[in-house]
Amino acid sequence: ANKKKSQPAEVEVQAKSYQKQLNEEIAKDRELHEKKPLKNKDNDDDQTPTPPATKRISQSKTDPECGLFHKGEHEKQFAYVANTACDRHNFILDFVLGAGNIHDSIMFSGLFEKVLKKFPEMQATAVDAGYKTPAIMKQIIESGRVPCVPYKRPMTKDGFFKKYDFVYDEYFDCVLCPNNQPLAYSTTNRDGYREYKSNAKICKDCPMRSQCTESKACQKIVNRHIWEPYMELAEDYRHTPEYRDIYKLRSETIERVFADAKEKHAMRY
């Protein structure tokens, strides 16, 4: 569809497949830390049902079901995306189609369940960095399979400490900063992240503050997902030669599938 023939549209935000389970675990985590339960957005005092959350998108006039796909920083096009799974011999096992504005990680769950049902003998799953999320790592590991993932570059500013510079202390449930000062637990938010906050009085005179935070309150906040242990386990697998070699097979398997689709079946735009 022509990307110039579009119109603004208000659409309902689709709930994530794991949202119910995440909400339950957030409630348990808050109770464990003696925090009040989060208010349910659907329960108001006047008992009036809350309308579903919506978002504003650019919708194609020609094909309203497709989505605006962003390729890189400047290129975009109305399109569909195909999330595809194949085996080590390059045979396609299954796929799911979705609008171009749906992130790959959202579509993964349905595809993984379909492949798992057809091929229960599967032992490992190689995915790229776009699928490296706590929910996906949890789903793969709890199914008894091994996730084979790549290194993912820290999303922090140049010159600032990376997330791995802040070490989590499981025994005391706190985070230690590069200056060996503790960041105490503060709360667990709706997205499933525990927030750890530093002592502003200590940070104010810290010699490393310019590399740590630009906060006017002189306070560093580090987020840690309640499913972070699954991410850490995936990192352990990443350093294992057996699973590192499995990930390297992507270049000659699924990448070949995409190359054939683009070159031989006119799927390149």
Tell what function each PLM region has.
Residues A1-Y269:
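Anion-binding and metal-coordination hotspots
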